Amino acid sequence: MNTVRVTFLLVFVLAVSLEQADKDENRMEMQEKTEQGKSYLDFAENLLLQKLEELKAKLLEEDSEKSRNSRQKRCIGEGVPCDENDPRCCSGLVCLKPTLHGIWYKSYYCYKK
């Protein structure tokens, strides 16, 4: 009976020690995989961040070009004298010689088209 107990105890101790070794090995393996996964995630995150910054810069550049091109510079309103050679009338207006009123000024004025 004693030999059975000793044998059982020996097998039990051996099983527990092997199980502990397997757990440690598995834990180390999982830790390595996690670290590798983090490095891959960091790389992917940096790559995505660079692409987003490039897109943002491109969009801001296009917006600034649009606003620069669409914005009207200082212009002359309707009924205001303008220069025939350099008309700065606002959009929808043209620099014309006045008919009837204002002929005595010998100047051009901005009128609607």
UniProtKB/Swiss-Prot annotation:
The places in or outside the cell where this protein is found are: Secreted
Can you list the GO cellular component terms from the UniProt entry?
A: extracellular region
Cysteine disulfide links: 75-90, 82-95, 89-110
What range does the record give for the signal peptide? Answer: 1-21
User: Which is one GO molecular function term here?
Assistant: sodium channel inhibitor activity
- The primary site where this protein sits is secreted
Entry's InterPro entries? Toxin_22
Pfam families from the UniProt entry: Toxin_22
| Segments traversing the membrane | none
Q: Which UniProt keywords apply?
A: Disulfide bond, Ion channel impairing toxin, Knottin, Secreted, Signal, Toxin
- Give tissue specificity per the record: Expressed by the venom gland.
Q: Which residues form the propeptide?
A: 22-74
Q: According to the lineage, what is the superkingdom? A: Eukaryota
The Swiss-Prot or TrEMBL record describes its family as follows: Belongs to the neurotoxin 14 (magi-1) family. 01 (HNTX-16) subfamily.
Q: What does this protein do?
A: Probable ion channel inhibitor.
Q: What is known of its domains?
A: The presence of a 'disulfide through disulfide knot' structurally defines this protein as a knottin.
Q: What is this protein called?
A: U11-theraphotoxin-Hhn1a
The organism of origin for this protein = Cyriopagopus hainanus
